[in-house]
């Protein structure tokens, strides 16, 4: 019999603790949780700026009305399926949504949103994210027990804020945590 209580973290933000391997992909990362069930979890990192790309070239938009390049930042969402692109965006845009959440965020993964963004008709706020982060059943729960992640309520202004390199430090401040208070030793007493 399993007496553990399952807490659904869909729509929450995971904040990596300093116990996550330094130099690893998840070091100082923030992940918006798309789905969390007893079967596993999926999320998108939103503070790993990779590059800036031209939407027209990246999505092979065949529209002659878009003359100038439309440069947008591109973020690494995680180590799974880098060939897949997702837009994490505000819900003022609601065409062909992949996922729609109650906290004013949505996810789209289609050519139409990239064209609408290029024409200035897209969502007010959006992040282009490639790849995602996934956990199999019980894996995220184990990582939470090992103090690898902190859980924070979603804040869309925080997600879409500029300066991705400062978001992790700002998340700790938001949670009232001073990074210096983390022990350099991993484990439990």
Swiss-Prot record:
> Quick one: a GO cellular component term?
cytosol
- Residue stretches spanning the membrane: none
Disulfide bond sites: none
- What's this protein's family per the entry? Belongs to the UPF0301 (AlgH) family.
Name of the featured protein: UPF0301 protein A1I_00140
Q: Which organism is it from?
A: Rickettsia bellii (strain OSU 85-389)
Its ancestry begins with: Bacteria, Pseudomonadati, Pseudomonadota, Alphaproteobacteria, Rickettsiales
């Amino acid at each position: 019999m399993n007496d553990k209580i399952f807490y659904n973290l869909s729509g929450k933000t995971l904040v990596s603790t300093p116990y996550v391997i330094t130099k690893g992909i998840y070091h100082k990362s923030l992940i918006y949780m798309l789905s969390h069930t007893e079967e596993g979890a999926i999320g998108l990192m939103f503070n790993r700026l990779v590059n800036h790309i031209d939407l027209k070239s990246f999505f092979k938009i065949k529209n002659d009305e878009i003359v100038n390049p439309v440069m947008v930042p591109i973020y690494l969402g995680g180590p799974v399926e880098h060939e897949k692109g997702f837009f994490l965006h505000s819900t003022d845009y609601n065409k062909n949504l992949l996922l729609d959440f109650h906290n004013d965020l949505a996810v789209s993964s289609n050519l139409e949103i990239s064209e609408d963004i290029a024409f200035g008709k897209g969502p007010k706020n959006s992040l282009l994210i490639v790849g995602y982060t996934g956990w199999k059943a019980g894996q995220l729960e184990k990582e939470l027990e090992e103090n690898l992640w902190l859980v924070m309520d979603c804040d869309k202004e925080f997600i879409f804020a500029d300066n991705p390199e400062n978001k992790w430090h700002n998340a700790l401040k938001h949670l009232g945590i001073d990074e210096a208070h983390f022990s350099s030793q991993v484990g439990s007493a």
